[in-house]
Amino acid sequence: ENTARLFNASNSFFDNLSEFTSGKEKFLYYLQNDKLNLFVNAAGHIIHGQSFSTETSNVEFFDLGIRARGTVLDHLGYSFSFSKGGIAGSKSLAATVDPRLKYNFKFVEDIENIPNYDYTEGYLRYEVSPADNMLIALQLGREKIKFGYGYGNSLIISGEGPNMDILRFDFRYGIFSFSSIHASTVGEYNDAIQARYSKYIASNRMKVSIPDLFDIGVGESIVYSGRGLEWAYINPLLFYKYAEMSLQDRDNGTVFLDLQTSFIKDFEIQATFFLDEDILSNLQDLDLFSNKTAYQFGFLWYEPFSIGNLSLTCEYTRIRPYVYSHTDYMNTFTAFGVNLGHRIGPNADEILTKIGYNFSSRARLNLEYRHSRSGENIYNEDGTLSKNVGGDVFQPYRYDVDDTHLSFLDGIQHNYDFISAGLRLEPWREIFLDLTYTYSQDKNLSTGNKNVISYLVCKLSIEY
């Protein structure tokens, strides 16, 4: 048997505990029979972050959680998890080391004497296969969402935002697949409870997979708020942009196309084209403010130049001004104040390169370099907006005020360089040690000022 159980009546507790460093898959408890599967794990993390910037600082994280998952009668799947953690040291460094803290309510609220955070996820998923090569599934739960491709970040929904409460429908038959989600989340954090609000995101994606050639998909998303559930957006068999027009054009709609190839062995290409709002008029006038478009393309090459266990990834992303923004700030393409799409935001581009090398099944080296450029809005000394160049997802275009035409990267240009080197070790099964060094530099080309951040993170992860 290749599994170990901490709570196992067949052995003493200490005999079970001795399996901690074994090569077996470990559980607190598991149950398997022809009707029910249940697997329960405990997971904990100890993290130390050390900054080497102008002001040296450090931070420590400690968290512990439980995860349970399984199936009932082969059709109903379930998962449940939660974790709670505390922080000692620099809060600003903590949010740099773990960006998830920027949208964690307990961390942002910051009213307790010890900074802390918590996370919880869970879902129920019912799945059937009524015919060969056919799958139908309905899922209700809370988890992260990722829609679309992207080796660095997806242009559509990156999966790096907060967990959302989701109703999901999936259908697959042969080469055709379709997914539809309706999710709820929240807006920016506000100290005043009455100013907090919920918002909703609906998205559909249809994909055709041609074996050994490519997968091609088309999809759409809608962000809306200020009211309860909009029944039109719960219907998966509807073109949301046209439905949004019939609902008096209050919401933020996007459309996207994406492609992933498989016709070259060990070499994969991904590409995405993203259209925000205006999808028909003036597409030939690329500098018009309403042409809120973005595109991304890249490749993954496994064992390039016949170098075993090596992977090489390159990707370019370009996002025009005002993408992800909306005339109603509550309908921006954000959750808890964090951009749901690509991290660089509007009026920006990025070149990304990743190299991964497996020394063995228990040791992996990861190297990453990113160079991005962004054009930021110009503000007066008193904080008022002087020139809007579409560089802020929360600052929409102002009719009769802002320029109707603008160049890409207009405004105050920043060049950002990011370098990361990480080593992951698994000395024993499900016990991981991660060592990561990060260096980043943000240069304001108008003033020549630089903001440099460098830090080392040591992370111990244990699951039993």
Label for each model-derived stretch:
Residues E1-D215, S221-G226, D287, N291, ...:
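Outer-membrane beta-barrel channel domains
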Residues Y117, F214-I222, R227-Y464:
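Exposed, low-structure sequence patches enriched in small/polar residues
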